[in-house]
Amino acid sequence: MAHSPVAVQVPGMQNNIADPEELFTKLERIGKGSFGEVFKGIDNRTQQVVAIKIIDLEEAEDEIEDIQQEITVLSQCDSSYVTKYYGSYLKGSKLWIIMEYLGGGSALDLLRAGPFDEFQIATMLKEILKGLDYLHSEKKIHRDIKAANVLLSEQGDVKLADFGVAGQLTDTQIKRNTFVGTPFWMAPEVIQQSAYDSKADIWSLGITAIELAKGEPPNSDMHPMRVLFLIPKNNPPTLVGDFTKSFKEFIDACLNKDPSFRPTAKELLKHKFIVKNSKKTSYLTELIDRFKRWKAEGHSDDESDSEGSDSESTSRENNTHPEWSFTTVRKKPDPKKVQNGAEQDLVQTLSCLSMIITPAFAELKQQDENNASRNQAIEELEKSIAVAEAACPGITDKMVKKLIEKFQKCSADESP
């Protein structure tokens, strides 16, 4: 369904007469966010430093519901552990989203200069847990916890960001069953499209803890599609290496395949690893200073993506599998079920044609680029699937889901 940019409404939308280019001074670009470019800026009225996310709604037409969702969630949050949202302005087809500026970068940025020690990890995890405890108390699920979505201020304050796939639980709907998130960090029950709740964030936190310790999540050397098969089938990842027993136990607690046995965020704040090792957030400024030194030494070739994580220009997904841009998997909502930017009834849909089938065919054709007859057969098969999808929207999703179920069943039958 097409959307006219002028018809877009989001919480905190300012009077359309107000010109954001007069109210704010746009400075250097600091990254590419979930749906557009992000700039450092100055509020000319207060001289406050802000982050300005600018989205061309004509180009981001398919993502408008996700943009509304992110702004809706942020506008409802009032926590020092969640990125603050100040308001939005519409100028032509450009939506200006004004947010809190966090100049310390993302945890993923800081990891580029090297892994963290356990005191730094415990300190960062404690702040993430405070953010999750707040969100879960508000019946919200982040659904995309990872180092790229954890931002720091220059003083070391830690905040959760990127709420484009966040979900809202109601009193009558205590679990969700929508396939969203990022494969490497995704909980088994989310991949299987089973009913899930805030405990899915706890699994992602456990994977993030490993990421902070090792510099990357488990299975990062594998194809993301294979990871989707393996996470529900295999035993949970464990932290291997010279780490303390309490840290390994913290991760094991988060990565229980049965969500009912995972602790809550509030319970994890009392875990021995957090209590004994966490320090004041100012302790994290050493990581920020280290990253600045690392960049000054000429190690950084890519632009930092501190204020948004979808492109993750330095991430292992894009480096290892250039044909796949497999970061955050986002839902495709039914516009009829979106009211005031909040999706009331999420559709259980994975965009398999664009996320899985098309990239898979591209890889097959690349592998057999010198075999004309094989490539022609691949193209014919790809066209047939596209025709079937056009005639019966959603049929590809059902087919891939069924293939995953069959694969998992066969794998389980073959297991000793």
From Swiss-Prot:
Cofactor or coenzyme needed: Mg(2+)
Pfam families: PDCD10_N (PF20929), Pkinase (PF00069)
GO cellular component: apical plasma membrane; cell periphery; cytoplasm; cytosol; extracellular exosome; FAR/SIN/STRIPAK complex; Golgi apparatus; Golgi-associated vesicle
GO terms, biological process: apoptotic process; cellular response to oxidative stress; cellular response to starvation; intracellular signal transduction; microvillus assembly; negative regulation of cell migration; protein autophosphorylation; protein phosphorylation
Coiled-coil regions listed in the entry: none
Keywords: Acetylation, Apoptosis, ATP-binding, Cytoplasm, Golgi apparatus, Kinase, Magnesium, Metal-binding, Nucleotide-binding, Phosphoprotein, Serine/threonine-protein kinase, Transferase
Main location as per UniProt: cytoplasm
Stretches for region Disordered: 297-340
The reaction(s) this protein catalyses: L-seryl-[protein] + ATP = O-phospho-L-seryl-[protein] + ADP + H(+); L-threonyl-[protein] + ATP = O-phospho-L-threonyl-[protein] + ADP + H(+)
GO molecular function, one term: ATP binding
Residues found modified as Phosphothreonine: 178, 327-328
Result when mutating residue 36 to W: In a gastric adenocarcinoma sample; somatic mutation
Superkingdom of the organism of origin: Eukaryota
Subcellular location: Cytoplasm; Golgi apparatus
Residues the record lists as Phosphoserine modifications: 4, 300, 304, 306, 309, 325
Binding site residues for ATP: 30-38, 53
N-acetylalanine modified-residue sites: 2
InterPro entries linked: Kinase-like_dom_sf, PDC10_dimerisation_sf, PDCD10_N, Prot_kinase_dom, Protein_kinase_ATP_BS, STE20/SPS1-PAK, STK_MST4
Functional summary from the UniProt entry: Serine/threonine-protein kinase that acts as a mediator of cell growth. Modulates apoptosis. In association with STK24 negatively regulates Golgi reorientation in polarized cell migration upon RHO activation. Phosphorylates ATG4B at 'Ser-383', thereby increasing autophagic flux. Part of the striatin-interacting phosphatase and kinase (STRIPAK) complexes. STRIPAK complexes have critical roles in protein (de)phosphorylation and are regulators of multiple signaling pathways including Hippo, MAPK, nuclear receptor and cytoskeleton remodeling.
Family: Belongs to the protein kinase superfamily. STE Ser/Thr protein kinase family. STE20 subfamily.
Name by which UniProt lists this protein: Serine/threonine-protein kinase 26
